[in-house]
Amino acid sequence: FIHQYDFSVEQRLDDFLSEVTMRGVALDSSAVFTFCLNPGLTVRSVDSDGQPLKFKRDKQIVLVDFGTNLAKGDTASVTFKYDGQIDNSFCYLDIPPEVLQASKKKFLFNIDKQYCFQTKDYLLLTPETYWYPRAGTGYSDENPDWQQTYFSNYHLKVKPLAGLVPLSQGEGKSDEHGVYTFKGDFPSQTISLAIGDYQQKSISADSILYSIWHLKGHDFFSAALDSIHDTI
């Protein structure tokens, strides 16, 4: 299982470039280990401690050959470099097609379904897209073991397009080069990444800072809160 992820993500006009280093423990003895990554993303290289590793790609499955047998309980690290666009058809394979394709209506409007967004103005990557490599096969209709859940530590660096702000789990900080870092206080199962023209509104109470981020032009709530400002 993976106990540590170190990411770097660069947003581009219509896709993204990423490098992810994973550190983990072998749950079984083997030389070849299985990872899952969205099939729309192209793996450029895989290495371990600077040494290139052979790998085979079959849609979402990436088989990585470490070149030597790792015993159960051994620790190892592996780095993926990849880029591209998310393939939405891979999302929610565990949900029956008739449920996914069922019409959703609100009054006269058909509500479309979109699992991620990749444009020059907005990026949204949720865990269901498998936008970063994860150990195992992802969904399987033959073995329920794919549903195993592990908690990992995440450290994320993001370089957004000019004028945009990234958001993810953990406290975010930016440097003079416009690179943002996020690091959670506790391990989590998965993480998401959103990048857009976000604006922050904050209030401090009892030494705790509460913040809301909204897209520019989407502040539909501040005026309604004026009358209770002293209460909240």
State where each predicted segment sits.
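Surface-exposed beta-strand/loop patches in extracellular or lumenal glycoproteins
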Residues: L17, T21-G40, S140-W146, Y150-L161
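Juxtacatalytic substrate-recognition/specificity segment
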Residues: V20-M22, L156, T181, Q199-I232
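Beta-strand-rich interaction surfaces with strong enrichment in secreted/lumenal proteins
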Residues: F7-V9, M22, Q51-K54, D65-L70, ...
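N-terminal, polar/Ser/Thr-rich
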Residues: F1-L17, R44, D49, C116, ...
